[in-house]
Swiss-Prot record:
<feature type="binding site">
    <location>
        <begin position="226"/>
        <end position="228"/>
    </location>
    <ligand>
        <name>iminosuccinate</name>
    </ligand>
</feature>
<feature type="binding site">
    <location>
        <begin position="139"/>
        <end position="141"/>
    </location>
    <ligand>
        <name>iminosuccinate</name>
    </ligand>
</feature>
<feature type="binding site">
    <location>
        <position position="297"/>
    </location>
    <ligand>
        <name>[4Fe-4S] cluster</name>
    </ligand>
</feature>
<dbReference type="InterPro" id="IPR023513">
    <property type="entry name" value="Quinolinate_synth_A_type1"/>
</dbReference>
<feature type="binding site">
    <location>
        <position position="47"/>
    </location>
    <ligand>
        <name>iminosuccinate</name>
    </ligand>
</feature>
<keyword id="KW-0411">Iron-sulfur</keyword>
<feature type="binding site">
    <location>
        <position position="68"/>
    </location>
    <ligand>
        <name>iminosuccinate</name>
    </ligand>
</feature>
<keyword id="KW-0004">4Fe-4S</keyword>
<keyword id="KW-0963">Cytoplasm</keyword>
<feature type="binding site">
    <location>
        <position position="200"/>
    </location>
    <ligand>
        <name>[4Fe-4S] cluster</name>
    </ligand>
</feature>
<keyword id="KW-0808">Transferase</keyword>
<dbReference type="InterPro" id="IPR036094">
    <property type="entry name" value="NadA_sf"/>
</dbReference>
<dbReference type="Pfam" id="PF02445">
    <property type="entry name" value="NadA"/>
</dbReference>
<dbReference type="GO" id="GO:0034628">
    <property type="term" value="P:'de novo' NAD biosynthetic process from L-aspartate"/>
</dbReference>
<comment type="pathway">
    <text>Cofactor biosynthesis; NAD(+) biosynthesis; quinolinate from iminoaspartate: step 1/1.</text>
</comment>
<dbReference type="InterPro" id="IPR003473">
    <property type="entry name" value="NadA"/>
</dbReference>
<keyword id="KW-0662">Pyridine nucleotide biosynthesis</keyword>
Length: 347
C-alpha cells in the first residue's frame, strides 16, 4: 500500500454488550417504542444483522428489514417524517443522504462498522490521489466522506456487474474498503482492481479448519457464504451472495440443511423464508482459537429495545444523524450513479 495507515493492523475496541432485559422489561419497551413511533410520525428500518427481536418489531410496526441501501430507499419513499435506523452509523448517514428533509434517528451514534473505521477519509484520499488513473469504487459500508470521494458506490449484490461494466470500458479500479469482497470481484471479472485492505470483523473470522470439521458432521448441508469472507471460505461455498441473495439461495437450493457464513442476525428472515430447513452457523474459530465477534457484529448488538426507545424519546445530538450539505451532495452523486446503473440492469 502507498499510505501509512494499515487497516489490517488496526484493532477496534468492541463496545460493551447491552445489559439483558427480562421479559417484563422487553414488553415495556416494545409498547413504548410502538407508542413513540406513532407520536413522532416515525417508521423503523432495521438491518438483517440486528437482533431478532428488533427485526420482529420493525415488521410489527410497518417498517422494513433489509440491507443498508434498501433501508434508506424504503425510508425515502415512506410518508413518515422521521426514520429510526436500527443498524450502524454509516447506514444512518446513507438514509440522511437520500432523505435530507427527514429526521434520521439512531439508537446510538456509537454503533460503528470495522469497514467504515478501517477506511478513514484522509488516508483514503491520499491513496486515491496516488492512483489518479483509477476509477474509485467504494462499498456502501463507508462514511459519507468516503462516498463523496468516490466515483461509484456499490452494494455486494451488484458489485460483480458494476465492475464488469467498468472493465468493459477499459477502466482500472480502486476498490474499498473490503479486501475480501474486492478480491472476489476481481476473480469473478478479471478486472484490474487495486484493493484497500479493510475487512469486516465478523466475516474475516470464518475459518476453513473449523468449517471443514462441521461439513464432515453435516455432509449433505449446503454452504452459503457472504463475499466479505476470506477467499478460502468462498471457495468452499455452494452459493455466494449478499444478504438478500443468500436468503434467495436458501429457498432455491434443494438441501434441507444450510450452513450460513455471515452474521447470524440473518437467521431471522432466512428461517422465515425456509421454515422447513435447518440453519447452522458457520464456525468462526480455527484450531485452538477463540472468536472475537462470534458471527454477530458487536455494534449491531447495540441496537437494543431500551436504546431504540431512548433514541425516539430523546432525539438530539446523541441520536440524530447530521450530514453536511456539501458532503451530502458529493456523496449523492455516486449513489445516484449506482441507482441509475441498477435501473438499467432491471430494465
Amino acid at each position: 500500500m502507498s499510505v501509512m495507515f494499515d487497516p489490517q493492523a488496526a484493532i477496534y475496541p468492541f463496545p460493551p454488550k447491552p445489559t439483558p432485559l427480562n421479559d417484563d422489561e422487553k414488553q415495556f419497551y416494545r409498547e413504548k417504542i410502538k407508542r413513540l413511533l406513532k407520536e413522532r410520525n416515525a417508521v423503523m428500518v432495521a438491518h438483517y444483522y440486528t437482533d431478532p427481536e428488533i427485526q420482529q418489531l420493525a415488521e410489527e410496526t410497518g417498517g422494513c428489514i433489509s440491507d443498508s441501501l434498501e433501508m434508506a430507499r424504503f425510508g425515502a419513499k415512506h410518508a413518515a417524517s422521521t426514520l429510526l435506523v436500527s443498524g450502524v452509523r454509516f447506514m444512518g448517514e446513507t438514509a440522511k443522504i437520500l432523505s435530507p428533509e427527514k429526521n434520521i434517528l439512531m439508537p446510538t451514534l456509537a454503533a460503528e462498522c470495522s469497514l467504515d473505521l478501517g477506511c478513514p477519509i484522509d488516508e483514503f484520499s491520499a491513496f486515491c490521489d496516488a492512483h489518479p488513473d483509477r476509477t474509485v469504487v467504494v462499498y456502501a459500508n463507508t462514511s459519507a466522506a468516503v462516498k463523496a470521494r468516490a466515483d461509484w458506490v456499490v452494494t455486494s449484490s451488484i458489485a460483480v456487474e458494476l465492475i464488469e461494466h467498468l472493465d468493459s470500458l477499459g477502466e482500472k479500479i480502486i476498490w474499498a474498503p473490503d479486501r475480501h469482497l474486492g478480491n472476489y470481484v476481481q476473480k469473478q471479472t478479471g478486472a484490474d482492481v487495486l484493493c484497500w485492505q479493510g475487512a469486516c470483523i465478523v466475516h474475516d473470522e470464518f475459518k476453513t479448519q473449523a468449517l471443514t470439521r462441521l461439513k464432515k458432521i453435516y455432509p449433505y448441508a449446503a454452504l452459503l457464504v457472504h463475499p466479505e469472507s476470506p477467499q478460502s471460505i468462498v471457495e468452499m461455498a455452494d452459493a455466494v451472495g449478499s444478504t438478500s441473495q443468500l436468503i434467495k439461495a436458501a429457498k432455491t437450493l434443494p438441501h434441507r440443511q444450510l450452513i450460513v457464513a455471515t452474521d447470524r442476525g440473518i437467521f431471522y428472515k432466512m428461517q422465515q423464508a425456509v421454515p422447513e430447513k435447518e440453519l447452522l452457523e458457520a464456525p468462526t474459530a480455527g484450531e485452538g482459537a477463540t472468536c472475537r465477534s462470534c458471527a454477530h457484529c458487536p455494534w449491531m448488538a447495540m441496537n437494543g429495545l431500551k436504546a431504540i426507545a431512548e433514541g425516539l424519546e430523546q432525539g438530539g445530538a446523541a441520536h440524530e444523524i447530521q450530514v453536511d450539505a456539501a458532503l451530502r451532495e458529493g456523496a449523492l452523486l455516486p449513489l445516484n450513479r449506482m441507482l441509475d446503473f441498477v435501473a438499467t440492469l432491471r430494465a
